[in-house]
Curated annotation (Swiss-Prot):
It comes from Arabidopsis thaliana. GO terms for cellular component: nucleus. This is Auxin-responsive protein IAA16. One of its GO terms (biological process) is auxin-activated signaling pathway. Residues 118-218 form the PB1 domain. A motif (EAR-like (transcriptional repression)) lies at residues 9-13. The N-terminal half of the protein contains two conserved domains I and II. Domain I includes a slightly degenerated ERF-associated amphiphilic repression (EAR) motif which seems to be involved in the activity of transcriptional repression. Domain II is required for the correct degradation of the protein through the SCF-mediated ubiquitin-proteasome pathway. Interactions between Aux/IAA proteins and auxin response factors (ARFs) occur through their C-terminal dimerization domains III and IV. It is found in: Nucleus. Aux/IAA proteins are short-lived transcriptional factors that function as repressors of early auxin response genes at low auxin concentrations. Repression is thought to result from the interaction with auxin response factors (ARFs), proteins that bind to the auxin-responsive promoter element (AuxRE). Formation of heterodimers with ARF proteins may alter their ability to modulate early auxin response genes expression. The keyword Transcription regulation applies. Belongs to the Aux/IAA family.
């Protein structure tokens, strides 16, 4: 029979034999596989090194929880003393809060008492382009108030009540004389919203009931005299 292997055409160097070619093929295959294995080993080694570095970095980034506050001292404080000291802290806070409440209440009381010691009212005058504000608590009598108003509005003529007319209730004759002899007369608005002549009630009652003062012309205040006398009689 014909030996096909012997007659098979092969590419190779002259003088080469089949065994050498097979050996070359085998050697070539082994060289490729070894190269692939070497690359795989290198890549796995690199991955292992990278993973180790990442793990170390992650460990460094992890922040440890802060340690609990402990009582520091020398000699060392025992555990039961620590518990006693920690239990006393809320008591100190409660005492501070109580002091704050006490100071707040005392401040409110002082502000209320300060408001009770002053009685500010606005003062206006017919024809005057400005307003004034006075504290009625600063004056003791109607005469003191009249003198103060005369100084505030010095360019206007305000009726002079005299030392006797301001102490007690003013009678009808005094009111009429006052309105007829003065260009301007001081009046006030009481708590009821009525306009009255200044001097129709005792000074303490006037300070408590006065909301504002208006110095109006005497001709416009004539109608206030009978009403003031009638209201004074009703109060008495």
């Amino acid at each position: 029979m014909i030996n096909f292997e012997a007659t098979e055409l092969r590419l190779g160097l002259p003088g080469g034999n089949h065994g050498g070619e097979m050996a070359g093929k085998n050697n070539g295959k082994r060289g490729f596989s070894e190269t692939v294995d070497l690359k795989l080993n290198l890549s796995s080694t690199a991955m292992d090194s990278v993973s180790k570095v990442d793990l170390e970095n992650m460990k460094e980034k992890v922040v440890k929880p802060p340690a609990k506050a402990q009582v520091v001292g020398w000699p060392p404080v025992r555990s039961f003393r620590k518990n006693v000291m920690s239990g006393q802290k809320p008591t100190t806070g409660d005492a501070t809060e109580g002091n704050d409440k006490t100071s707040g209440s005392s401040g409110a009381t002082s502000s209320a008492s300060a408001c009770a010691t002053v009685a500010y009212v606005k003062v206006s005058m017919d024809g005057a382009p400005y307003l004034r504000k006075i504290d009625l608590k600063l004056y003791k009598t109607y005469q003191d108030l009249s003198n103060a108003l005369s100084k505030m509005f010095s360019s206007f003529t305000i009726g002079n009540y005299g030392p006797q007319g301001m102490k007690d209730f003013m009678n009808e004759s005094k009111l009429i004389d006052l309105l007829n002899g003065s260009d301007y007369v001081p009046t006030y608005e009481d708590k009821d919203g009525d306009w009255m002549l200044v001097g129709d009630v005792p000074w303490e009652m006037f300070v408590d009931s006065c909301k504002r003062i208006r110095i109006m012309k005497g001709s416009e205040a004539i109608g206030l005299a009978p009403r003031a006398l009638e209201k004074c009689k009703n109060r008495s």
